[in-house]
Amino acid sequence: MADTLNVGVNLEAFSQAIHCIQALRSSVTRVFDCLKDGMKNKESQEVRERAFVSEFQDNLHCVNRDLNELERLSNLVGKPSENHPLHNSGLLSLDPVHDKTPLYSQLLQAYKWSNKLQFHAGLASGLLNQQSLKRSANQMGVSAKRRPKVQPTTLALPPQYIDDVISRIDRMFPEMTIQLSRPNGSSAMLLVTLGKVLKVVVVMRSLFIDRTIVKGYNENVYTEDGKLDIWSKSNYQVFQKVTDHATTALLHYQLPQMPDVVVRSFMTWLRSYIKLFQAPCQRCGKFLQDGLPPTWRDFRTLEAFHDSCRQ
């Protein structure tokens, strides 16, 4: 690394130029000090003026001498080689204070992320090409003879089947109580009470979960007219965090062909919060971090992590 950087640079002249810059700064400082102090007390006005002018001229000569020396050394320093393998970005890693210059590591991370994104995009493109629709020109032109769209059967499940799925999930977890209601027609709404830890309002569309709101056990989950409140957030930051993680879990557990498995998997994940205030973080081993318990639960192992420790 040192040999690469030394190509084309006279290090001895470079060192002398640094000392010359320091000397030039000292000379300029003496000039301004002379102007600041003015004429010193002497026997007569004429003597004071001559002493002041003489001292001022000497200081200016020193500035001129140091400036000429700096110009001479600058011509001897030379220029660094332009054949550096990483060009200017390679110099970012030379600063030993990594906390002040994290740009180099961020560039490497962005490069790895870009390669991974390109790899996954290629896989997705191959899968989509296998499932591409083949339509002829005649089929595209005759819109009146098209077959009517068939609605997915999973969106039109009978209420009895949904009630049976929720009832079986309720029996699976004794510490979890699930209350089902249909205040707006066929769409079900669930009030899940997990021990004496928290309550969850779940809005469903058939067997698909649309929205979840997590609140504390002692918080009110009803509106003034007695209906479940599906809009207001919890007053506590810990349950707001759990609400965000539950929304992420809904995006993770996706299996449109088997919606009952999705609901059961989500409820199993939600049940892991029974020890929200008792389980330590599996990464740092602490119960609290920034005043909050471990609010994240791994989707596969259900282990507890702080939001910053799960990265």
From Swiss-Prot:
GO cellular component, as recorded: mediator complex
Residues of the signal peptide: none
Pfam family, one: Med27
MF (Gene Ontology): transcription coactivator activity
Record keyword Protein biosynthesis present: no
Compartments, as annotated in UniProt: Nucleus
Keywords per UniProt: Activator, Nucleus, Transcription, Transcription regulation
InterPro entries for the chain: Mediator_Med27
Transcription regulation in keyword set: yes
Coarse class of the protein's main subcellular location: nucleus
GO biological process: regulation of transcription by RNA polymerase II
Subunit structure and binding partners: Component of the Mediator complex.
Family listed: Belongs to the Mediator complex subunit 27 family.
PANTHER family: 34 KDA TRANSCRIPTIONAL CO-ACTIVATOR-RELATED (PTHR13130), MEDIATOR OF RNA POLYMERASE II TRANSCRIPTION SUBUNIT 27 (PTHR13130:SF4)
Job of this protein: Component of the Mediator complex, a coactivator involved in the regulated transcription of nearly all RNA polymerase II-dependent genes. Mediator functions as a bridge to convey information from gene-specific regulatory proteins to the basal RNA polymerase II transcription machinery. Mediator is recruited to promoters by direct interactions with regulatory proteins and serves as a scaffold for the assembly of a functional preinitiation complex with RNA polymerase II and the general transcription factors.
Name used for this protein in its record: Mediator of RNA polymerase II transcription subunit 27-A
